[in-house]
Amino acid sequence: MELLTFRDVAIEFSPEEWKCLDPAQQNLYRDVMLENYRNLISLGVAISNPDLVIYLEQRKEPYKVKIHETVAKHPAVCSHFTQDFLPVQGIEDSFHKLILRRYEKCGHENLELRKSCKRKVQKGGYNEFNQCLSTIQSKIFQCNVHVKVFSTFSNSNQRRIRHTGEKHFKECGKSFQKFSDLTQHQGIHAGEKPYTCEECGKDFKWYLIFNEYEIIHTGEKPFTCEECGNIFTTSSNFAKHKVHTGEKSYKYEECGKAFNRSSTLTKHKRIHAEEKPFTCEECGKIITSSSNVAKHKKIHTGEKLYKCQECGKVFNRSTTLTKHNRIHTGEKPYTCEECGKAFSRSSVLNEHKRIHTGEKPYKCEQCGKAFRQSATLNKHKSIHTGEKPYTCEECGKAFSRFTTLNEHKRIHTGERPHKCEECGKAFGWSTDLNKHKIIHTGEKPYKCEECGKAFGWSAYLSKHKKIHTGEKPYRCEECGKAFLCSRALNKHKTIHTGEKPYECEECGKAFGWSTYLSKHKKIHTGEKPYRCEECGKAFRRSRVLNKYKTIHTGDKTPKCKGCGKAFKWSSYLNQHNKIYTGEKL
């Protein structure tokens, strides 16, 4: 008869083997060893060397204590583990369920069973032990060198505690299944933060959070999605990334709707409960999230805590300031792998990628038209509803979007906040500035597959394609005339309405379109920004410059179909054609 010892239900690691385990595996080791210790104590087995237990509870390296020195002192309790208690197939099943689910790294073919527990036993002592033994749970450690299996024993009382959650912490009443979790939880009440980052000095309560935080300094991103190649610094963020699997593990029993994040489920529950606990006293707006209350209040108070040291502009949020700072630094950390173009924001990069993929995920339910951006879809929807809730106080013109109204107001104020860094020219709209920049870069990334013509802006390409298709979707309700683009239709409408909202402050002359007013103003200012590189002559309009250039090149492209005569300018050709039509010149 041999005594049951702590060594029979334990596993030893050398310092080299201990380093092979990751933090999660080390924590699992501590939990199992401490549970084995408590199970032996409950069976009446006294441990002669408690130093190992103390080391484990203090989260010190266990290999500093010799496990074989911990000898059982109770003669009545002995061990007799046969293959009936530890079937190989059962171990393999446990291996697949526990390790493959948790680590997904190795197979069961390299499994080593510990067979040191085959011993003879007194019949009475065995029966006493067998009565206390309710389950055998196989715990497995995975190491780069080898895999070991060992068992933990739990009597019926301890098993009942595990299922009913009777391990309570007296301070707050919270219960835990593992002793290490209880120890870590006690640190919250004590304010203890035992894990300190050597790089920046930040303290943490939990080892796992500390371990993931250290990766920020190294720049390491160990979690890679095999489906799309996205990389993550933490396992929690990687777990949240379930785009490809479509997995939605958080289900609401009320309506059956499922979500891939618990936070989204919590927000959804408020819809059913009609829980809208936060109401703004200033404007009456209902806010479902407490975190957004303080942010919303800053709209009314005008509080802007975050100031840009470069230009003095202030912001409500630190994240907005960070994005703004990139304007001054020129930082563009997000680069397109397809064309090499860089962006200051990841969201803009994601939208840009759709140019290459052709993806248009936002579809209009009314007409089926698809868009790359959700904002463009929202603008498009106003075409069907005809709703225009935003009205200009200056001229009474109505708009479907608030941003469009703000842009319109610049017509009256003359404000041009968007300035070209290359030539200093200012624009009232950012879109016009972006179009203008192409003049300096010469970039034309949008190419027509039909004829090969390239354009600097996607909108120009879309308009150009209609030439090949003959599509003219914008029709005048007054006379039925159709146009390729909405802007041309709006210009045409002024013929019927006689509306001329754009008035020159210098001479009072009015125009139906802002571009005509801009061209007209150059008469008063004498500005001639378009200069001929050949002779230096300057012009107010680019079109006139292009016509003038034919003098130097000798190009006479417009030809009369009747007589074949060529002209420098198309306007001369039009006048010439009147000879044949009999129209008065």
Swiss-Prot record:
Mapped zinc finger ranges (C2H2-type): 141-163, 167-189, 195-217, 223-244, 250-272, 278-300, 306-328, 334-356, 362-384, 390-412, 418-440, 446-468, 474-496, 502-524, 530-552, 558-580
GO MF annotations, alphabetized: DNA-binding transcription factor activity, RNA polymerase II-specific; RNA polymerase II cis-regulatory region sequence-specific DNA binding; zinc ion binding
GO cellular component: nucleus
Keyword Endoplasmic reticulum: no
Keyword line: DNA-binding, Metal-binding, Nucleus, Repeat, Transcription, Transcription regulation, Zinc, Zinc-finger
Highest taxon of source: Eukaryota
Residue intervals passing through the bilayer: none
Location in the cell: Nucleus
Domain KRAB: 4-75
InterPro entries: KRAB, KRAB_dom_sf, Znf_C2H2_sf, Znf_C2H2_type
Pfam families associated with the record: KRAB, zf-C2H2, zf-C2H2_6
Gene3D superfamilies, per the entry: 6.10.140.140, Classic Zinc Finger
GO BP annotation list: regulation of DNA-templated transcription
Function description: May be involved in transcriptional regulation.
Family note: Belongs to the krueppel C2H2-type zinc-finger protein family.
Name this polypeptide is given: Zinc finger protein 732
Organism of provenance: Homo sapiens
Primary gene name: ZNF732
